[in-house]
Structure formats: structure tokens, C-alpha cells
From Swiss-Prot:
Coiled-coil ranges per UniProt: 241-319, 397-430
Record membrane topology: Peripheral membrane protein
Main location: cytoplasm
Species whose genome carries this gene: Dictyostelium discoideum
Gene symbol of the encoding locus: dynB
GO biological process: mitotic cell cycle; mitotic spindle organization
This protein's UniProt keywords: Coiled coil, Cytoplasm, Cytoskeleton, Dynein, Membrane, Microtubule
InterPro entries: Dynamitin
Function text: Modulates cytoplasmic dynein binding to an organelle, and plays a role in prometaphase chromosome alignment and spindle organization during mitosis.
Region spans: Disordered: 1-51, 201-228
Subunit structure, interactors included: Subunit of dynactin, a multiprotein complex associated with dynein.
UniProt biased composition (Polar residues): 32-44
Protein name: Dynactin subunit 2
Record-stated family: Belongs to the dynactin subunit 2 family.
């Protein structure tokens, strides 16, 4: 379409500038809309961790780690292997009554205490492995320091059991006694209620017999008993607490642990920290695994390399003996030269005394030269100050002259204005 026909086509439409070219708006492609929708959905999702990862730091973190797949079964069988127990009492998580992460359920003090013991124990063992390998958890944070801090935490948890008020709540052994005391009190209360019930039943039977006796006269009497009607049953509620049975199981397991610790000390375990038997068995298995044929071949290759190095050391010893003979000759030559220097050494004290006498002269000359240099510096400073002062005086003279001229001009202007004002006043008065 030609440009001449264009204004006629849009002449009657509102809000249209006919002087500009036609422009057509097209919708964006659907891909950008979908991308925006995806981005908005990803931004709303709070479970995604958007922290940037640094490859160097992650490499340092997993550099000394090894993958252990001993307990994994890659066969096609459905049968699940029974996982052996590793560690002591605190490692078996099923022993403790640890609640799931649910807001409706609240942990008891005993459950919280046991959970903290378990978490601190497991975390300390992880840090002990890192400390044995000599690694670092993070930058400038060693595993040994963390193990010491975790040991302090365990001591603080153990000190809680020493408090007499907290022992019935936190100690499993004391808790069994606490529950037994509660049961004894409840049983005594039940017996007292049964006795009171029997007494009430007897009293009610006697009152009924008295009311049923016939009267000798023909007159009828209405007898009303003022005693209150008592119920003929006793309600006794029994509450079963699962913590008692669990505490008894824990007490049995603790007794077994103590017996095992005594056996370990009797067999010659001299370490202060009690190491569980499963851990020692795993260490023995690791030592026995060194007797494999593949590892023995590796050891043979290492022995061959060591023998080659020993032979190279023998060759180096022979070369070192030759070097020692040459060194002995050099030492003899040095000894002869030192004997010659002994004669010169006898004259050294006289030379030293002469140097001491010359030292005072040199020091006086140095001090005099320093004074002269200071005087020269002061003279230069004074000359520079005089030059700067003269330049400033010249500038002051120039500025005074310019200021006088401006003042004179201002005075003349003021006088002229005053004269004009006086003339105007005279004219107005006339």
C-alpha cells in the first residue's frame, strides 16, 4: 500500500498518529512464556537449595573418602542379610524410644536425654575416624578439636545423672525404682478403697434388716433413711507405661555391657576408653584381609622395590667413602694453613688496640660532618622561607593596590548616588 493512501485509511480512528509508520504487535513465542512459568515455579519452591557449589572445596572434602560396600548385597536374591550389631548400647537406635518429627507428639525428658546421648556418641565416633586419618572437617577445623569438645559434652550429660532430683527421670535404673514406688502407692490405695467398700456394704445390710421388722400394733409407720445411697462398685484405673519395660530391657543390656567390659579388662585391654567387641572383631578382620593373594603380591612387589633401594644405598655408601678420603686431604691442608695463621694471630691484639684509638677520631669526624650537614639543611630552609616570604609580600602589595582601586571606585559611585538622591529630594521639595 502506498504512503499517500495510508492517512486516509486511519483518518477517522481515535488516538492514531497518521504521520508515523504502521507498527503491528505480535505475541511472544510460547517458549518464553513456559520458561517464565518454570522460573516462577522454581523460585516459589523453598525445598531447592540454590547455593553455588565450588568444585575445589568439594574435591577437598571427598578426596580421602573411600566407599565401603561390604554390607551391600548386589545379588538377585530377595533374602535380606541381617546387619550385625556394631558398637555399644548407644549405637543401637532401636533400643531408645525416639519419637518421629511430629509436632503433635512431645518428647519426654528421658527420650530427649537418650536421643542426645545417641547423637553425641555417633557424632563423636565420626569425628574420631576423621581425627585418626588426620583430616579436617572444614578449613582450619581439625577433627581432634571436635572430639575433645564432644567429650566435654558427654561429661556434661553424665553430670546430669549425679543430680538427685533428676535421677528418677533420666537414669533407667532409678526410673524402675520410681515406677515400683508408684505401683506400691497405687496398690495401697486400692486395698484401702476395697476395705472401705466392704465396711459400707456391711452397714447397708444392717440398716435394711432394721427397716423390715414388723410392728406389734396395727398402725403403719413410714420409715425414711437419711443415709446417702452408696455405689456398689469400685472404679480402679490401670495405666500401662511402655517406658518401664523399655527401661528394664535397657537395664539388662547395660548389665551385659558391664560384663563385657570386665571381660575386656581381664583379657588385657589396657586402653582407658572402652572399645566394643564388634569394633575389635572388625579390626581383626581387616588384619586378616591383608593375607589375601592379591595383597601378598603387592607386598612382594614392594619388597622388591625396597631391595633395589637398599642396593642403591650400598652404592651410595661406596661413593661416600671415596668422598671422605678427599675430604680428609682437604682437612689436612686447612690444618697446615691454620698453623701458619697462628703466627699472624699473635700480632692481632696490637692491631686491635690501634683500631680502638682510631675509632674515637672517626666518631668525632662523623659527628662534625653531621653537624655541618644539619647547618646546610637549616640554611637551605631559611633561604627557601625568605624566597617564599618575598613572593608573599609582592602578592600582598599587588592585592593592596587592587583593593585601593576598588575602594576608590566604590566611593566615587557612592558619592554620585548621594548627589543624585540629593537632587531628587530638592526637586521633590520644589
Amino acid at each position: 500500500m502506498s504512503e499517500g493512501n495510508q492517512p486516509k485509511r486511519v483518518l477517522g480512528l481515535p488516538d492514531v498518529d497518521p504521520s508515523q509508520q504502521d507498527t503491528f504487535e505480535t505475541p511472544d513465542p510460547p517458549e518464553s512464556i513456559s520458561n517464565l512459568a518454570d522460573e516462577s515455579s522454581e523460585l516459589v519452591n523453598e525445598s531447592i537449595d540454590r547455593s553455588s557449589l565450588k568444585p575445589a572445596k568439594s574435591h577437598l572434602k571427598f578426596a580421602n573418602r573411600k566407599f565401603n560396600n561390604d554390607n551391600e548385597d548386589f545379588s538377585d536374591s530377595i533374602y535380606k542379610k541381617s546387619v550385625p550389631r556394631t558398637g555399644g548400647l548407644l549405637k543401637n537406635q532401636t533400643v531408645f524410644d525416639i519419637l518421629p518429627s511430629d509436632e503433635s507428639k512431645v518428647e519426654t525428658p528421658l527420650q530427649k536425654f537418650q536421643r542426645l546421648q545417641y547423637e553425641v556418641m555417633s557424632f563423636r565416633e565420626e569425628m574420631q575416624v576423621i581425627a585418626d586419618n588426620g583430616g579436617e572437617v572444614e578449613k582450619d577445623i581439625k577433627g581432634v578439636d571436635l572430639t575433645h569438645q564432644l567429650a566435654d559434652l558427654q561429661n556434661q550429660l553424665s553430670h546430669l545423672l549425679e543430680n538427685e532430683k533428676l535421677q528418677p527421670i533420666l537414669d533407667e535404673n532409678k526410673q524402675v525404682i520410681h515406677y515400683s514406688q508408684i505401683q506400691n502407692n497405687s496398690s495401697k490405695k486400692l486395698i484401702s478403697e476395697i476395705e472401705s467398700f466392704t465396711q459400707q456394704s456391711l452397714s447397708s445390710s444392717t440398716t435394711e434388716q432394721n427397716t423390715q421388722q414388723p410392728s406389734n400394733n396395727n398402725t403403719t409407720t413410714n420409715i425414711t433413711s437419711s443415709s446417702s445411697i452408696t455405689p456398689n462398685h469400685v472404679t480402679y484405673e490401670l495405666f500401662y507405661t511402655g517406658e518401664q519395660s523399655k527401661s528394664q530391657q535397657l537395664q539388662r543390656i547395660q548389665d551385659l555391657e558391664k560384663r563385657l567390659a570386665k571381660l575386656e579388662t581381664a583379657t588385657g585391654n589396657k586402653t582407658t576408653d572402652s572399645v566394643p567387641i564388634t569394633q575389635s572383631i572388625l579390626e581383626i578382620k581387616e588384619k586378616l584381609s591383608l593375607l589375601d593373594t592379591t595383597k601378598i603380591d603387592v607386598l612382594q612387589q614392594k619388597m622388591k622395590t625396597v631391595s633395589k633401594e637398599m642396593e642403591s644405598l650400598k652404592i651410595q655408601d661406596e661413593t661416600s667413602t671415596k668422598a671422605l678420603t678427599t675430604n680428609e686431604k682437604k682437612i689436612n691442608d686447612i690444618f697446615e694453613t691454620m698453623n701458619k695463621w697462628d703466627i699472624v694471630g699473635q700480632q692481632v691484639p696490637a692491631i686491635i688496640n690501634r683500631l680502638y684509638t682510631l675509632r674515637s677520631l672517626h666518631e668525632e669526624g662523623i659527628s662534625f660532618s653531621n653537624h655541618v650537614s644539619n647547618l646546610e639543611k637549616q640554611q637551605n630552609d631559611i633561604t627557601s622561607l625568605l624566597i617564599s616570604n618575598s613572593s608573599l609580600m609582592n602578592k600582598m602589595d599587588d592585592s593592596f593596590k587592587s583593593n585601593l582601586l576598588t575602594i576608590k571606585s566604590n566611593i566615587q559611585q557612592l558619592e554620585s548616588r548621594i548627589e543624585t538622591l540629593q537632587n531628587r529630594q530638592q526637586q521633590q521639595q520644589q
